[in-house]
Amino acid sequence: MQVIWFKKDLRTEDHRPLFEAAKHGSCVCLYIYESELIQSAEYDTSHHDFINESLAELDQSLRELGSHLVLRVGEVTQVLGELHERHPIETLWSHEETGNGITYARDQRVKAWAKANQVQWKEYVQTGVVRCLKNRDGWSRARNQMMSKKIIAVPESIQAVTDLERGRLYDQHEFGLPKNEKSRLIAGGEKTAHQLLDSFLRNRGQHYSREMSSPVTAHDACSRLSASITWGCISVRQIVSALRQRQEDVRQAKKDGMPTGGWLSSLKSFDARLSWHCHFMQKLEDEPRIEFENMSRSYDGLRESDFSQERFEAWCVGHTGYPMIDACMRALRQHSWINFRMRAMLVSFSSYHLWLHWRQPAIYLAKHFLDFEPGIHFSQVQMQSGTTGINTVRIYSPIKQVKDQDPRGEFIKQYVPELAGVPDKHLPEPHKMSRDEQNQSGCWIGRDYPEPIVDHLTAYRAAKERIYAVRKQASTREEARRVVKKHGSRKGPTQPSRRTRQSAS
């Protein structure tokens, strides 16, 4: 019996384990609700609902091929053991996964179980991540070669094992998860993923390069494929393939004298971000400890002892007194998605202005990001917190972000309605309104909307002083060289950056 173990690859096209297993006889298409993952701090009902939507569509697709999903709940090796007792498993087929500590430990158990039971476990690559990589030399070339390979077709048919209980979809309440109160912007499933890709490449993405930073325009201008990629409803290679075709079409149109608008620059920007997807995942693959520890050990102890639960809770619920911070956090809590620039701002604010160690905010955000991908998430959080030791220190100004990204307050007033009557000119710093202005706007600071939790300039200066006290040390520079050697991109300069940016950001 062949077992195809579906995890974060909930699709039938470009699925090599499925394609290969179908050649070898009777198959079980298995998905396991893993209790340890579901009960983890990073898991949310929104994740569960998205997965169930994807599983329902996957099951229908498999039925059209003559098979179906077999759904189980429990610890993976126990489930495999029960199946193995019923029908001896010849080969376990799956994709490689670069996940969190829970999935890493689980994979070690599966490896031991397969060896003990003489079951062959075949894992296949589905991203640009390379296992057992010594350094980043040549990584980009290997990633690009992987992305240029032919898309794997859906099997013509799958011979199913017919005498196993199929199981069913399990709702969130069966795992003790609360009812989903969020209005997700993205649905699960392979069809939705391809619809999003097509609408982005043909319509929505024309001004991606200039509209992706503002939360006002990002919802339409961004691809919104991140959750579909995370849960494997579409592969990065499928996206790259479609992107290459679209780039070719646009270049040809330009040669033919047709207007192409901003398409070429936008498609180039999108291409770069697809590469970054694999680049950041590779960091966690190479050094799993960065899920829990500072990438650069020079920053150990920098913030850990100063953690303020009061500040953290205000940040979590969007009551910091900074409109852009609060609007973004409330939007995220409502929709499970916010654009990248605003994610970076949220982490920067928690790390620098509130001086919170990155780990607890990272877990909170992971729970609310529908597209939570451990390799990208923990690498990015550390980058925005300044603990990689090699990246530019970016201290985002929450005041400047209002002026740059939402000058008319469209986004802010939607998600922070208590500021609806505040004139646009006061939205960056509503606490500076006079008493008469507060009265006229119907928003009293300290009653209807909080005072700033910290003073921006004071917090900025203190954070800059403290982090640079560490960065200028010789031991920190030596540690930075180690980090660059292990994780640094080989496309540009590899020296640790000494720049600080407050407002670019």
Predicted feature descriptions by range:
Residues 1-271, 281, 388-505:
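Active-site "lid/cap" and pocket-lining segments within catalytic core domains
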Residues 224-425:
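Active-site-proximal binding-pocket segments
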